[in-house]
Regions:
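Hydrophobic alpha-helical membrane-association signature
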Residues: 32-35, 82, 112, 185, ...
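Short, charged, surface-exposed hinge/linker loops at domain edges
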Residues: 208-217
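Glycine- (often His-adjacent) and acidic-residue-rich active-site loop
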Residues: 3, 41, 48, 56-92, ...
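Crotonase-fold acyl-CoA enzyme core
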Residues: 91-204, 231-236, 241-244, 248-250, ...
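Generic structural signal for alpha-helix termini and adjacent loop/cap motifs
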Residues: 22, 46, 73, 236-237, ...
């Protein structure tokens, strides 16, 4: 049984990955995570795909890890399974990745949402890292990405209390880009994806790399990395096309080269 649905051309240049364990509120078991990893790898290599949207359903983006699968495991079991290698590979996805969130995004679901470059949330969305309530803590980026997104004070509060925050609170603290009425989250994510898909894929990939580097290094090294990627855009056909189109007052036709 497959736990995700993949539509490579849901919109021109935009692929959709939909989590598909509705009875379990899209709880993230090992198979589902491996399917996401494999789908992203295939989409990363597909030149027709420029942006990927990942979503769940109205009730839940993903309500956390599959606790039934994890409950009996020991520390040694978790080390041997090495489930986090899958998360590391998802993190390395090079194209823009947009999360479309409705309902619960909790625990591993919140961590999966935070691997996205941008998030669109329904008004019904709730975000949280409630692992402490069951005697554990975030292990797939919840302490690191959340702190980078919302700051130490809010991250510490969410991680130590296990309390959820609403879509509007997530927007206020910088976790979410856009909040939309119920039922419009996927449409808005497609709209955002279409805007990005119309840009140069070369520039988008290099720009994504550069923004992410800002959280991984000191300023001087980050500026050096940014400058290197800026120079690389001038080795692309897209840069020539983009500037020619600007001068000629027409829309550019980017090819991703």
């Amino acid at each position: 049984m497959e736990f995700i649905l993949v539509t490579p051309q849901a919109q021109p240049g935009v692929a959709l990955i939909q989590l598909n364990r509705p009875k379990e509120l899209n709880a993230l078991n090992l198979q589902l995570m491996q399917e996401i990893r494999d789908a992203l790898k295939a989409l990363d290599e597909d030149d027709a795909v420029r942006v990927v949207v990942i979503t769940g359903n109205e009730r839940a983006f993903a309500a956390g890890a599959d606790i039934k699968q994890m409950a009996g495991k020991t520390a040694i079991d978790m080390l041997i399974t090495d489930q986090f290698s899958t998360w590391d590979q998802i993190r390395k996805f090079r194209k823009p990745l947009i999360g479309a969130v409705s309902g619960f995004a909790l625990g591993g679901g919140c961590e999966l949402a935070m691997t996205c470059d941008m998030l669109v949330a329904s008004e019904t969305a709730q975000f949280g890292q409630p692992e402490i309530r069951i005697g554990t803590m975030p292990g797939a980026g919840g302490t690191q990405r959340l702190t980078r997104a919302v700051g130490k004070a809010k991250a510490m509060e969410m991680v130590l209390t296990g309390e959820f925050i609403s879509a509007w609170e997530a927007h206020r603290v910088g976790l979410v880009n856009r909040v939309v009425p119920v039922g419009q989250y996927l449409e808005e994510a497609y709209r955002l994806a279409a805007t990005i898909a119309a840009m140069s894929p070369v520039a988008a990939r290099l720009a994504k790399e550069s923004v992410n580097r800002a959280f991984e290094t000191h300023l001087d090294e980050g500026l050096h990395f940014e400058r290197k990627n800026f120079y690389l855009t001038f080795a692309s056909e897209d840069q020539k096309e983009g500037m020619a189109a600007f001068v000629e007052k027409r829309k550019p036709a980017f090819k991703g080269r």
